[in-house]
Amino acid sequence: MEILGFTVMGGGGSPAWIEVPEKSKSAFWELKRRKVHRYVIFKIDDRREEIVVEKTGAPGESYDDFTASLPADDCRYAVYDLDFVSDDNCRKSKIFFISWSPSVSRIRAKTIYAVSRNQFRHELDGVHFEIQATDPDDMDLEVLRGRANRT
């Protein structure tokens, strides 16, 4: 299969998946289990072969720090660990998978990220919510809080 001049084929004509290295999976597990990171930002490497960790945020970093770390003109995947107080006044934590595909990013990048999103998301067991964002308003902190409070 060819997508915008990029051939996506494996042996026997099956789709070739972009690899998720152990280091990328470990960064997610460190966020989920050990609370070492507040967020992890992933990108598809320049060879379009692997989904790699681009940046991690320390537990004390804010949501604004996270959103400022996303490029304004290129796609990324991210996981964010949202701590919040629920409507019934309980402290909770929910993990969000965010597919960031700004409207100004290249069509080729949008396509490659869209094609590999489900495969990557499947590797991250324990994500509570998924958000697909093309604009900062799509992933405003209040949007996340609203989704988290509905559970």
From Swiss-Prot:
GO biological processes: actin filament depolymerization
CDD domains tied to this protein: ADF_cofilin_like (cd11286)
Keyword Membrane: no
Ranges in a coiled coil: none
Example of a GO cellular component annotation carried by this entry: cytoplasm
Keywords attached to this entry: Actin-binding
Domain ADF-H residue range list: 15-149
Superkingdom classification of source: Eukaryota
A Pfam entry, by short name: Cofilin_ADF
GO molecular function, one term: actin filament binding
Keyword Oxidoreductase set for record: no
Function: Actin-depolymerizing protein. Severs actin filaments (F-actin) and binds to actin monomers.
Classification via PANTHER family: COFILIN-RELATED
Protein family according to the UniProt entry: Belongs to the actin-binding proteins ADF family.
Protein name in UniProt: Actin-depolymerizing factor 10
